[in-house]
Amino acid sequence: MFNFNYGLRTITLNHPQKLNSLNGSMARKIIPRLQEWSKSQLANVVVVKGEGRALCAGGDVAALALQNKEGPEGQQKSKDYFALEYKLDHMIASYTKPYIAYMDGITMGGGVGLSLHAPFRIATEKTVFAMPETNIGFFPDVGGSFFLPRMDGQMGTYLALTSEQLKGVDVFWSGIATHYLHSSSLPDLETRLAELQFKDYDSLQQRLQVINSTIEEFCTGVPHDRHPSNSIVGGDLRVAIDYAFQNNSTIDQILEALQGLTENKGNTAPPSVIDWAAKTRKTILSRSPTSVRVALRQLREGATWDIAETFRKEHVIASRFMEHPDFVEGVSALLINKPKTTPQWKPKSLDKVTDADVDAFFAGQPSLELLNTEGKAEEIRYKDYPHAWTGLPREREVLGHVNRNRCTMKEAVEFFVQHSGGKQGVKEKVEEILRRKADESESGALTLKR
């Protein structure tokens, strides 16, 4: 459903009974509208939102699995669907007008593709985020290869392999959302966005700055009981995530690290970490072994891919999964069979998935032709989001500042608060990073931990 209100253009996904799951028909309707609005001088801002409990709970994977059972012809239809979806996601990632995603409710899979690459991603107390693909014999697609490895520390790898959910303000602390608002504020924000006026010669950057300030006006504070230090994105659990999923670790090394935390032989791990490690190890071992191994390699390689390369290579991987039995098995077990069944993965364990098996998912020349907003074949390329400044400071930015400038905690916090224009959550985020990653001398000067 498409709405017009002064300079605001709204895309509303309105299949609440199916949690607004994305299908080919919806994608085919959205793409030409985005192209039309990009050329319209009357369209200033685009908002995407969902009716009911979800922005979008994912693609209609049940329909794809049933299609795949038909054999090569059905599998080709599924491959064509992913080509269409990734073209839409790339268009959003390179859109020439301000684009805002209301992540107000369940935002998973295909819904992540509609929001993750937007310059503005608004979480609320109702937000539930996840990349659940390894649980259905698939991989974290829709540009996950780009976003996840660029998250702070090893959060992206953890979320990809486990399908773990983040809820509410934790979606904001993690950097997945750029802003956190109470859901009751969203209609008023929409009205305000419709009233915004820009000069014809205003650059995209200038327009984004105005919208950023406008959204901040509606921020009423973050929950006092969900400081980043007592959530999974900070504190002891975050230290454990970065340790267990550290760069260049193989899946066997990750499982070994989790086992070590579970056994706690040095008596150094708090009970919350011990419980988390045991649960996380069990979760990974229950996922599709093929999906887990492919996803880990995907994230390691995706850290160097540009945004266009990401979607083209993901289409190769997705096409291979449409031919693999685990996708049909996982979707059937979780979403089609009544009651749900336990999936029988093939191969059934991680040690049975060979390097050659994984290589096959990355083999072949990418052929996906991406579109720009004029409908022409064009690949917008960047290796980091040009609009990354709209969110909270990233860990590497905070640590880089401290490394370059001998400063105190107070000075570092003041710098980032001022640099962000007083953005909500900056103080808490910077403090949590520095308490976890730096030591203070008697004079208060910070030194990064080794």
For the regions a protein language model found, what residue spans apply to each?
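Conserved CoA-thioester-binding segment of acyl-CoA-metabolizing enzymes
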Residues: 1-49, 364, 384-386, 393-450
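A structural preference for short, pocket-lining loop segments at secondary-structure junctions
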Residues: 6, 11, 29-72, 91-102, ...
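An acidic, glycine-rich surface segment that forms the CoA-thioester-binding/catalytic face
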Residues: 31, 62-103, 144-146, 359-362, ...
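Hydrophobic/aromatic residues within transmembrane alpha-helices
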Residues: 48, 60, 114-115, 170-171, ...
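Glycine-rich beta-to-alpha active-site loop
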Residues: 92-136, 158-168, 179
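Hydrophobic, secondary-structure "cap" segments at the distal end of domains
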Residues: 146-154
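Contiguous mid-protein beta-loop-alpha structural module that forms a pocket-lining wall or clamp
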Residues: 154-200
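Amphipathic alpha-helical blocks and their helix-capping loop/short-beta junctions
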Residues: 182-287, 291
